[in-house]
Amino acid sequence: LKGVHIENHRIILRLNSPLANRHFQQIIRKWYPQETDYALFSETGKEDSKAVSIAIPPATFNALYIFLHAFVHFLNSGIGLRQLCDWTCLLANRHKEIDATTLLRQLQDLGLLHAAQAFGYIAVTRLGLPANRLPFPLEGTKQIGEQLLEDILSTGNFGQHDNRIKPRPKGYWAGKWYTFCRATRRCNELRQFAPYEALWYPVTLIGGTIAIQINRLKGVKDKKARTKK
């Protein structure tokens, strides 16, 4: 669509914890495509012959997913207030369509309720979201909520404004080691938000690097085999 920017992802999202990721993939399979909503988009803003029907997730899933997407980036490198504003706007404007009981249970099953409460604390105390738009209480969340806010203001979007971080080395393996050390250190500092996600993130980095090297070796072997033919 003209004027609409679309960011394509190969997968919706993958969590670091194997158990949590299994739960999340099951949640995806539950609503897609059985409970998919459709919206009509056109350049005129009206329903006409050029209107395009686009599949969109139900509001309850979006309330979970937008939080998860922001949290994964927060744990990896940092986020700006923009990501939290996206989630806050959804909760404020679509709350009647969100099944609060289901959303709460999903956050608990994924081990991310504590992290969501920290996000909710900022949404209510700083961004003006009415507390009754959240599916969980905020009692006892001030400390972790303020810690999240401090990190957001210190690191910025994807950690781009974090003056404490040294530049990434240019070499391939030096860069990989830099990323691993930075991720491990950050996960250790933020483990109280989501212990299992923090524990498994460095492991997934190692697994991803190994997978890349295996695929490269396979590619080299396949190329040699084709050359011989």
Where are these regions (language model features)?
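Conserved NTP-donor binding/palm subdomain of two-metal-ion nucleotidyltransferases/polymerases, i.e.
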Residues: 1-229
